[in-house]
Amino acid sequence: MTPQAFYQVLIEHGITLTDKQKKQFETYFRLLVEWNEKINLTAITDKEEVYLKHFYDSIAPILQGYIDNSPLSILDIGAGAGFPSIPMKILYPEIDITIIDSLNKRINFLNILANELELSGVHFFHGRAEDFGQDKVFRAKFDIVTARAVARMQVLAELTIPFLKVNGRLIALKAAAAEEELISAEKALKTLFSQVTVNKNYKLPNGDDRNITIVSKKKETPNKYPRKAGTPNKKPL
């Protein structure tokens, strides 16, 4: 997907990028490739592939109508090089973005990226989701939590649901359909007072399969969750 094809797809969805936004995506690509030589950020560095499999892929929740340009508070867990939240922030400047990542080198990259892109309303924290999920500053404070190819739902639910306000949404982006995964996650979702409201398969413009799953939080999360760092993955609910 060339940058021009990317812009055209957005126009077809009613979004016309300004010159500033186009430059932000261009700068994002350049910094991603530069920094990828120092630290491992992505296996994808070809320009057209980055625009398709990182930029376009990240904004799927916007293109499908699940996020609008309003002062939503969005937490991105395990964003790595900033996907999906930074492309969404470029598109919709009104949203407020927080990223938690376990690798400090990636946080350093994100700080430089945000500075170069002149983004405001972005906050980056180094650490584990399990630890932040028990912190009153972060717990039950977000409208939306996003996670792109982070963990299977049985584990992901415990890492993300505690951060949501009641009626907040987890938006999980994955490469393939999640039917069996959701069956395995039924107990975890029930324990965390949350339920799947959207499970939708779609395709990227090149035909690659993708899945978006949205989970809604119905009640406050029991205090014992999330458990200590590493436990959700070793002993899923």
From Swiss-Prot:
Record keywords: Cytoplasm, Methyltransferase, rRNA processing, S-adenosyl-L-methionine, Transferase
Main location as per UniProt: cytoplasm
Cellular component GO terms held in the UniProt record: cytosol
Root EC class: transferase
Subcellular location: Cytoplasm
One example GO MF annotation: rRNA (guanine-N7-)-methyltransferase activity
Residues that hold S-adenosyl-L-methionine according to the record: G78, F83, A129, E130, R148
InterPro entries: rRNA_ssu_MeTfrase_G, SAM-dependent_MTases_sf
EC number(s) reported in the record: 2.1.1.-
Positions of region (Disordered): 216-237
Protein purpose: Specifically methylates the N7 position of a guanine in 16S rRNA.
The family this protein is said to belong to: Belongs to the methyltransferase superfamily. RNA methyltransferase RsmG family.
PANTHER family the record matches: S-ADENOSYL-L-METHIONINE-DEPENDENT METHYLTRANSFERASES SUPERFAMILY PROTEIN
Protein name according to UniProt: Ribosomal RNA small subunit methyltransferase G
Organism: Streptococcus agalactiae serotype III (strain NEM316)
Gene: rsmG
